[in-house]
């Protein structure tokens, strides 16, 4: 039987039943599903979050089925505690059609999506929520509120995005960054992008050694390909303590980063080759294409999160399946539960 690479709704039900101590019998056609290693990595991450305190999360403009059910599903796993922000009549209409009981969820009524984004950021600044989740609105609309100079959620770090991915042909989950926020990052931007990803990987990785591959088209440094210069500089910045808590090597071509055989065939000696935890892409275009190629051609399981703001931002798209939405919330839960003592966040109590 072909192995499953998607953590589908039925299996989410089975995991939830296990957490609640109840009995669950899946439909006959998928009885005892045989999941591949990619799905197992994310199932393990979901189960490891058991016992975490749920993250009080502002869900921005959840006026369609996917965004509302994604938040509700994550709440069923006790991963988040949603605060639904948007036109109340539209939220209630979607809930009614999809048999969702809103009694347990706070709903804040605002008229438009941009008001919902602004309200979510306001709640985060007041520490009344500890995460933000994108609903049925454009990413630019949400992020413009997040990065607003006076009223946004900026920190001393550059805001960046990370995809946590798993494929059956690679032995462990890995991060691709930045494939969604920074279009053509400078060297200084990339330093923050790398550090943001390192910090996240330390939160979710049980083996604390983190290895970072800075990607380019080739593994040699040449002025003809400027991204090789950035990669070499980032590697040296790690040597000098400007990037911390990881081994950073670059430039590395993609094959050298993920395959020790490919690296050895080219005479490359690197502790990162074949064992990378983080793949740092040259720019948004290359990263976005790489992530989507792995998803649609390599059957990758993936989740996404925005880092570097005052709170984690769960950034999903309309095409994302339910498992990606739930696991993206799990990433926010890991961040919150690893940092709440330091940040003294009041939300979630």
Swiss-Prot record:
- Would you say which domain of life the source belongs to? Bacteria
The record's top EC class is transferase
Q: In which pathway does it act?
A: Metabolic intermediate biosynthesis; acetyl-CoA biosynthesis; acetyl-CoA from acetate: step 2/2
- Residue ranges annotated as transmembrane are none
Pfam families linked to this entry: PTA_PTB
Q: Which InterPro entries match?
A: P_Ac_Bu_trans, Phos_Acetyltrans/Butyryltrans, PTA_PTB
| A GO cellular-component term linked to this record | cytoplasm
Q: What are the EC numbers?
A: 2.3.1.8
* Location of the protein in the cell: Cytoplasm
Gene3D superfamilies for the chain: Isopropylmalate Dehydrogenase
Name which cysteines form disulfide bonds: none
Write out the GO MF terms: phosphate acetyltransferase activity
UniProt entry tagged with the keyword tRNA processing? no
Record keywords, A-Z: Acyltransferase, Cytoplasm, Transferase
Enumerate the catalysed reactions: acetyl-CoA + phosphate = acetyl phosphate + CoA
Q: Name one GO biological process term.
A: acetyl-CoA biosynthetic process
Family, similarity comment: Belongs to the phosphate acetyltransferase and butyryltransferase family.
PANTHER family for this protein: PHOSPHATE ACETYLTRANSFERASE
Q: What is this protein called?
A: Phosphate acetyltransferase
């Amino acid at each position: 039987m072909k192995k499953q690479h998607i953590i589908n709704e039925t299996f989410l039900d089975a995991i939830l039943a296990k957490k609640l101590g109840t009995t669950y019998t899946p439909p006959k056609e998928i009885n005892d599903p045989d999941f591949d290693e990619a799905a197992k990595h994310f199932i393990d991450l979901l189960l490891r979050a058991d016992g975490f305190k749920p993250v009080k999360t502002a869900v921005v403009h959840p006026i369609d089925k996917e965004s509302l059910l994604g938040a509700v599903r994550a709440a069923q796993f006790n991963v988040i505690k949603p605060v639904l922000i948007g036109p109340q009549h539209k939220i209630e209409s979607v809930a009614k059609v999809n048999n969702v009981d809103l009694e347990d969820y706070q709903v804040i009524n605002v008229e438009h999506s941009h008001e919902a984004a602004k309200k979510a950021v306001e709640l985060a600044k007041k520490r009344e929520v500890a995460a933000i989740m994108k609903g049925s609105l454009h990413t630019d609309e949400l992020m413009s509120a997040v990065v607003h100079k006076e009223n946004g959620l900026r920190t001393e770090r550059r805001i960046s995005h990370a995809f946590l991915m798993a494929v059956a042909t690679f032995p462990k989950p890995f991060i691709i960054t930045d494939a969604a926020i920074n279009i053509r990052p400078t060297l200084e931007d990339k330093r923050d992008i790398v550090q943001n990803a390192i910090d996240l990987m330390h939160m979710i990785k049980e083996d604390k050694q983190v290895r970072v591959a800075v990607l380019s088209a080739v593994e040699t440094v040449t002025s003809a390909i400027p991204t090789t210069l950035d990669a070499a500089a980032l590697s040296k910045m790690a040597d000098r303590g400007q990037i911390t808590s990881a081994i950073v090597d670059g430039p590395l071509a993609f094959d050298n980063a993920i395959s020790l055989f490919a690296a050895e065939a080219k005479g490359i000696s690197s502790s990162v080759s074949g064992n990378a935890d983080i793949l740092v892409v040259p720019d948004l275009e290359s990263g976005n294409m790489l992530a989507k190629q792995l998803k649609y051609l390599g059957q990758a399981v993936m989740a996404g999160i925005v880092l570097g703001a005052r709170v984690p931002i769960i950034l999903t798209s309309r095409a994302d399946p339910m498992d990606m939405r739930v696991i993206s919330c799990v990433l926010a839960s890991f961040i919150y539960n690893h940092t709440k003592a330091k940040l003294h966040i009041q939300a979630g109590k």
